[in-house]
Amino acid sequence: MFKARICGWIGLLPLFMLSLPVQAELRCVANAVDIEQFFSAATAEDKQQVEQAINSSVNLVPFGLSASDWKVHRGDLVVEGNIESNQKLIVLGNLTVKGNISTFSLSNPWVILGNVTATNIVTDSPLLIAGSINASGLVFIDSYYDNPSTIKGSINARGIFINDIIAPVVASSTNSEFMVRASDKNDTENVKKALMIINPDAYYWGLINDEDALKEIFKRSNIRMAGNVCNQMKKEALFRPKPSPELVQELQML
């Protein structure tokens, strides 16, 4: 029976979670463009420009602008292909990536003083974006420790996952087919929408068998789910072409 198969997956979940690392730096793109060539050491004037642009509307203390290892690109930046980085980066303009974006540091922020445009975005790094995020696919934002993420504009994407259990992720608005926040375990409708659209290989636990499991589906996973999302992004296979009739029926019953 369909239910029995689902229950079997759920029963294995605790053991599988224990076998995985609590923290990891996720690298989510294939054939990444070397972006070192576009950046140089940030000066005091660059950091002052960030402070003036934000104009005290965001608390910059968690971003530690006084650190010496910030890299900067002055003006708009357009990259042909996928990018990834674990460094502290500032873009004094718009960032347009004709591919996917992956940031795989748990503590090194990205500060963008314009809009960010890409296909898919998976980030472990704290974000401070003065404009909006525009993605034709998925935006997956993980927050760790005490490092918040702030998007002063909107997040526009086909799907949005936000893991904000440990640290807040703030955006002025969102526009998507689904938007799941890990902190809101009662929002089962958006979880159902996500399960209809996302490739099932992007969530290792299989499906779900009751509403209680549905409410916890992202809260109890976060980084483990992020790892599978990374794998599917590398394969350019984040979204399913069409949900199976069995899945449609299963979700309608919840």
Located regions from the model:
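N-terminal domain-start segments of secreted/luminal proteins
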Residues: 26-103
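Boundary at the C-terminal end of the N-terminal hydrophobic targeting segment
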Residues: 22-24
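Bacterial N-terminal signal peptides
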Residues: 9-19
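Long terminal segments
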Residues: 26-57, 146-254
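Acidic (E/D-rich), amphipathic helical modules within compact regulatory domains
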Residues: 108
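Absolute N-terminal positional cue centered near the fourth residue
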Residues: 3-4, 20, 99
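Extracellular beta-strand solenoids
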Residues: 72-73, 79, 84-85, 91-92, ...
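Bacterial N-terminal signal peptides that target proteins for export
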Residues: 1-10
